Amino acid sequence: SISFMISLYNQNKLKIHTNIGLSLPFGDITTNHKMGMEMHNHDHEILGHDHEVMRNAYGMQLGSGTVDPKISLTAIKYLKNLSYGSQIGGLFRLFENKSGYSKSSNYYINSWLSKNINSSLSISSTLIYKFLTSISGKDDLIIEMTSPESDVKNSSNQLLMSGIALNYLFSNSTLNGLRLAIEFQSPVMWFNNGVKMKLDNQITIGAQYSIH
C-alpha cells in the first residue's frame, strides 16, 4: 500500500492530520490446496464432479484483487506529561475482483490516552472499535460447505477491544532512536454475523528505529 500524511492543524499543542492512500493488489486471490482422498470422495459424491484441487477460503486469500482507497483522520492533544487522541478511518472495497467478489470493507475508531513516566518510559491505554462489512459477491470456486470461512454470510463482524501498552525509548548513544513496545489487548464486545472462531486476548511486541 501507499499513503500520504497531510497536516491540517498544528497549534496550541493540538495536532490534526489525515492519511490518504491506496491498498494495492499484490496478494494472491486464487490460492488452492489439494484434498485428501476421504474429502475427495465425499465432495465427488455430493457435487457430482471431481475436485482434486480446492480453492482456499476467503480469509486465506492474502490479496484483494482490487485497488482500494483508504483514509483516516487523527487528532492528538498534548499536555505536560499526558497526551490523548483519536483516529477514525477505513479501507473501502469499492470494486469487484476477477474472481467475482469484493472483500470486506474495514472501518475503525481508535482512541487512546498516554502518560509519560519519565523521559524514556510511557504507558498508554486504548479503546478500539472495528466494523468489518460482508463480502460482496462470490467466488464460484470456493465451496461454502467446506468451512464457515468459505461462506460469505459469515464474513461480517463488529468488535470492541481494550488494551494497555508500555513504550520504552532508548536515549543512550548506542541505541539512540530505538523504541520498544509491548501491548496487551482483550475483546470487550464481539458481534458476529454468522459463525466464526472465538477471539481471544492478544499480545503484540514491536520495535521501531528512527534515524536522525
Identify the residue ranges that each predicted region occupies.
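Outer-membrane pore/translocation modules
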Residues: 1-98, 149, 212
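Outer membrane beta-barrel transmembrane domains
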Residues: 103-212
